[in-house]
Amino acid sequence: MARTRIAGITVGQAPRTDMTADLESRLAPTLELVQYGALDDLTASEVERDLAPKPGDEVLVSRMRDGSQVTFSGTKVLPLVQERIDQAEREGARAIIVLCTGSFPELRHEVPLVYPQPLFHAAARALAGGRR
């Protein structure tokens, strides 16, 4: 029986086992997590050259496959995130989880797309019990 594919998309490079090992260990046997990274096709030098933040840009930080850290423009990486969403859908993903806690504008998608940030905010509000 084929497993249902769920895509995990990071703004850095995949795989991000530091972020997904716990999640994968809790998935039902009928589910498969396939990871995609917005920066998968780029080297650190290309990220620095092509995605460098300009004054006023939101600055994102992520990891490359080799464990090194890169900083880049949130605006400039969005088209690459969209490309990975499109790829995941073409490859049969039934749902997509964005593996980044930053805020994102609405991205185009055909399957359910989960953004962690609103979930974290809701959990924090619930835990705070109305306190600030």
Provide a role label for each language-model segment.
Residues 21-24, 110-113, 128:
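Short, glycine/charged-enriched secondary-structure capping and boundary segments
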Residues 46-47, 108-109, 126:
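Short, well-ordered secondary-structure micro-motifs
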Residues 5-9, 97, 132:
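Short glycine-rich or small-residue beta-strand-to-loop segments that form or flank ligand, phosphate
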Residues 2-72:
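N-terminal glycine-rich anion-binding loop in soluble enzyme alpha/beta folds
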Residues 24-29, 86-90, 129:
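Generic secondary-structure signature for well-ordered alpha-helical cores
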Residues 71-118:
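N-terminal glycine-rich phosphate/adenylate-binding segment common to multiple enzyme folds
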